[in-house]
């Protein structure tokens, strides 16, 4: 653990030198971790600002694990660009995010999965108990972010054995925000978070050919994007076909990016 302004500055530089494209910090206590209360803030404001300065020097940004409104506001005021989780946000914190142009990446499916399988997979009892303190609040947080104009990206935060649940996040989001906004969170908004608009999250000339063909219209039925790809007849990444059940497309064909 890096401790102190000089130490966090060095740690950020080292991670960037090793190829990190973004820097993530812990700005509050967590759920899966049994020893840090979720209401605590972590890192001093000077430490956070030092990390942000190093990220900006490398033309990138800082994302912060944060749950409470206090931790969220504090991190954003110090220059953090993206909040991960953010379940316990309040209206004041959402306004701060909007004013600073910050994003949030909710990770709601992980709480359902941890509530179901956490104990079986070895999650400590204290951590299992924390899940319910943020599970419903996470769903409620979507309404707060939407009401205050905070853009939401797509995330899952699932542990290794739970990755099969990640697309269920679409269903949870759609129940509250509607199908279109659930899809935008994983396409155009995600591209904006990564500062790669026009390259990712869009279908246009010159963009990376990351494409799927869906058997049906997910604007009508978001469940078409859930599961294990049962309704995806074509998956293309960077112009290369990884899955193809379309009768009208040659699976060996590839697109050559300019």
What would you call each of these model-derived segments?
Residues 57-61, 126, 134-218:
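His/Asp/Glu-enriched, well-ordered alpha-helical/loop segment
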Residues 249-255:
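Tyrosine-centered aromatic motifs in long, intrinsically disordered, low-complexity repeat arrays
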Residues 1-11, 61-63:
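Active-site mouth loops of central-metabolism enzymes
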Residues 26-140, 153, 158-160, 192-194, ...:
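Active-site core of metal-dependent hydrolases
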Residues 12, 52, 72, 94, ...:
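Generic hydrophobic/aromatic pocket-lining and core-packing "Φ" positions
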Residues 186-188, 192, 205-249:
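C-terminal cap of metal-dependent C-N hydrolases
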């Amino acid at each position: 653990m890096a401790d102190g302004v000089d130490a966090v500055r060095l740690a950020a530089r080292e991670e960037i030198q090793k190829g990190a494209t973004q820097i993530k910090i812990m700005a509050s206590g967590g759920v899966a971790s049994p020893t840090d209360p979720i209401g605590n803030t972590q890192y001093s404001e000077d430490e956070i600002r030092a990390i942000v300065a190093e990220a900006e020097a490398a033309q990138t940004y800082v994302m912060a694990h944060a749950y409470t409104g206090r931790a969220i506001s504090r991190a954003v005021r110090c220059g953090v660009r993206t909040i991960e989780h953010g379940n316990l946000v309040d209206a004041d914190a959402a306004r701060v995010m909007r004013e600073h142009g910050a994003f949030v990446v909710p990770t709601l499916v992980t709480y359902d999965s941890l509530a179901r399988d956490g104990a079986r997979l070895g999650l400590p009892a204290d951590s299992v108990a924390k899940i319910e303190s943020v599970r419903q609040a996470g769903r409620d947080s979507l309404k707060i972010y939407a009401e205050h104009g905070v853009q939401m990206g797509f995330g899952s935060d699932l542990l290794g054995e739970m990755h099969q649940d990640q697309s269920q996040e679409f269903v949870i989001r759609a129940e509250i925000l509607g199908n279109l906004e659930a899809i935008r969170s994983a396409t155009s908004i995600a591209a904006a978070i990564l500062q790669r608009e026009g390259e990712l999250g869009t279908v246009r000339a010159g963009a990376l050919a990351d494409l799927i063909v869906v058997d049906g219209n997910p604007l009508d039925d978001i469940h078409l994007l859930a599961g294990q790809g049962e309704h995806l007849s074509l998956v293309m990444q960077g112009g290369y076909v990884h899955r193809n059940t379309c009768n009208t497309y040659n699976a060996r064909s590839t697109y050559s990016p300019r």
